[in-house]
Amino acid sequence: MTHLPKPRALLGTLAFFVPLMLPTIPAASQDKAATPEKVPVADDVPSAQELSVWIMTYYQRPEPDKFGQRVRQLSARGMLKGNRPEFFTMFLGRVMHAHPERIAGWMEAWKDLPADELEILRNGIWNSQTDAGKQWLRDHKYAELADKPAPPLIAGGPMVLEPYHLDLMWEWFFATGAKEPVLLIVDKFPLNPQDPGDDELPPVPNRQGVDRPTFLRATIGRTAVWSAASLAARHDKLLEHLRAIRTDPRLPPRGKLWLDRVIQIAERDREKNAKT
């Protein structure tokens, strides 16, 4: 059987995923200056690998008190540079969604970051879909972004699926540990054109002689399977969600077969890792 590739960059965001309870911050709309969170930039900034682990395990140990500082550390390490559409905005947005009262203070503390990084942070605010976030955007002359329709992944609206959307789904899970993004990922398993066979993973899609939609569907299906299997070997919460989803009678036959394969790979790798 073909062995599962070791964790690596999925498509975009995961490229850097190497294997504060403050008082409510008054909104600027209340004619009060937002209270900036005091965010020291440590001389000894954690390594890119350490920050990647922090992102991937944030849901296990949420750190709203340190979130502002961590974002500055990501900036210092060059890890807030977007390399695909909607880069990092889902992770930011889901953390901000959990702490809307802090958005104004965080943004005040981040105001000296580079313009391209501030744009990512503003898009994170939009992704939070919170009243406090929308108000901050309006107060700072970004009303058009504030009034933009909610992200389809969050709102459940129609969308043209692209490979980078898997990155957004994983960002969502890393930020929250929620089941919903895992359901969205499992929903992509049936995009694989074949049921599981002798090889462990779906075949690498062949671009030649295939139209773009067909190629993208196969690429998304394969990436969904191997990323889920790889991550479930190390994330208890993810494996727990996958096992729960496995009992859903509405799963399409091909999706169920690939889910069985993902769970099998994850359990095998866990057992192997326990022996080493």
Regions found by a protein language model. Give the residues of each.
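Signal peptide processing junction and immediate N-terminal pro/mature segment
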Residues: M21-A33
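N-terminal non-cleavable signal-anchor helices
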Residues: P19, P26, P40-A42
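Non-catalytic all-alpha helical scaffold/repeat segments
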Residues: Q30-T276
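Juxtamembrane helix-loop transition sites at the ends of transmembrane segments
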Residues: M1-T2, I120
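Bacterial N-terminal signal peptides
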Residues: G12-P23
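Bacterial N-terminal signal peptides that target proteins for export
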Residues: T2-L14
